[in-house]
């Protein structure tokens, strides 16, 4: 009986050893299987990476397709413009001609708002009124400038006309030259007259001396020289008077405008300085307002 029991014990021990061996083999195979099979997290990250790469490649191809299509459209449009350029001018000319020949009917014309029409007519009226009143304003400015420059109380046109009609160059005998006093009514015109007569008197002396000679045939020539000299003196006096008055008026207007402009700039700068001071005091200081 001892031998069968020993045989049974040996079988049991061998069976236990085989079970341990098989269990170890199972554990090893399961570990190797887990190491070989990728984890779901890594699989998901790899799938996302592949999707991103695929989207980037698709975007590159789409941009290339768009660029190719845009270049083809530009070339096609350039070819169409080159082919239709000659016909376009003819068609435009014909369209302009037809539009010029066809009158706008009240049914097809675009109706404007009454306020816009009223404002346009008002601006046109103001423009024409300005054109009409502009010469009068210029005349008033010149008149005030002449009066202030020439120290005259009368109108400069009236003074010029009076000088042209009543001023005389030669005396009653025709051998003397007339010079007007400072207390006369001609004013500054009389002074300019005296200056021109004084500086041109040597030229006319020969004519005045030889007027009573024994050459009757040359009397009419001397008379013509006298008339020309009288005309020269009057025209020169009036031109100098006008030049003096206009230049003085322009100078006064320019100086006044410059003075007003400087005063305006000064007031604006002072106002800005005061405004900055008030703003800074209101921001930094205690509440005043």
Swiss-Prot record:
It comes from Saccharomyces cerevisiae (strain ATCC 204508 / S288c) (Baker's yeast). It is found in: Nucleus inner membrane. The chain crosses the membrane at residues 223-243, 248-268. One of its GO terms (cellular component) is endoplasmic reticulum. This is Protein ASI2. Keywords: Membrane, Nucleus, Transmembrane, Transmembrane helix. Coiled coil: none annotated. The lineage of its organism: Eukaryota, Fungi, Dikarya, Ascomycota, Saccharomycotina. GO terms for biological process: cellular response to amino acid stimulus; proteasome-mediated ubiquitin-dependent protein catabolic process; ubiquitin-dependent protein catabolic process. Residues 28-37 have a biased composition (Basic and acidic residues). The keyword Transmembrane applies. Residues 244-247 are perinuclear space. Residues 1-222, 269-289 are nuclear. Part of the nuclear inner membrane (INM)-specific branch of the ER-associated degradation (ERAD) pathway, required for the elimination of misfolded proteins in the INM, a specialized ER subdomain. Required for ERG11 degradation. Negative regulator of SPS-sensor signaling. Together with ASI2 and ASI3, prevents the unprocessed precursor forms of STP1 and STP2 that escape cytoplasmic anchoring from inducing SPS-sensor-regulated genes in the absence of inducing signals.
């Amino acid at each position: 009986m001892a031998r069968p029991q020993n045989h049974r014990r040996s079988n049991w021990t061998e069976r236990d050893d085989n079970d341990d061996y098989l269990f170890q083999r199972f554990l090893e195979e399961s570990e190797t299987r887990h190491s070989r099979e990728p984890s779901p997290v890594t699989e998901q990250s790899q799938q996302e990476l592949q999707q991103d790469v695929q989207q980037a490649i698709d975007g590159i191809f789409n941009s290339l397709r768009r660029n190719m299509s845009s270049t083809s459209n530009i070339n096609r449009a350039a070819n169409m413009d080159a082919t239709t350029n000659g016909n376009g001018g003819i068609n435009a000319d014909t369209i302009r001609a037809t539009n010029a020949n066809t009158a706008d009917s009240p049914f097809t014309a675009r109706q404007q708002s009454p306020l816009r029409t009223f404002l346009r007519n008002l601006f046109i009226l103001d423009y024409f009124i300005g054109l009409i009143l502009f010469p009068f304003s210029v005349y008033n400015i010149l008149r005030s400038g002449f009066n202030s420059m020439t120290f005259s109380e009368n109108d400069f046109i009236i003074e010029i006309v009076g000088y042209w009609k009543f001023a005389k160059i030669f005396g009653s005998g025709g051998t003397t030259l007339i010079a007007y006093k400072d207390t006369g009514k001609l004013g500054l015109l009389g002074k300019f007259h005296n200056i021109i007569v004084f500086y041109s008197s040597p030229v006319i002396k020969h004519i005045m001396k030889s007027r009573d000679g024994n050459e009757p045939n040359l009397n009419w020539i001397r008379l013509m020289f006298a008339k020309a000299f009288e005309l020269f003196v009057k025209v020169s006096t009036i031109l100098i008077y006008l030049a003096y008055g206009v230049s003085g008026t322009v100078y006064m207007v320019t100086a006044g405008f410059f003075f007003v402009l400087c005063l305006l700039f000064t007031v604006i700068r002072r106002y800005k300085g005061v405004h900055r001071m008030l703003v800074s005091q209101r921001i930094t200081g205690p509440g005043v307002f």
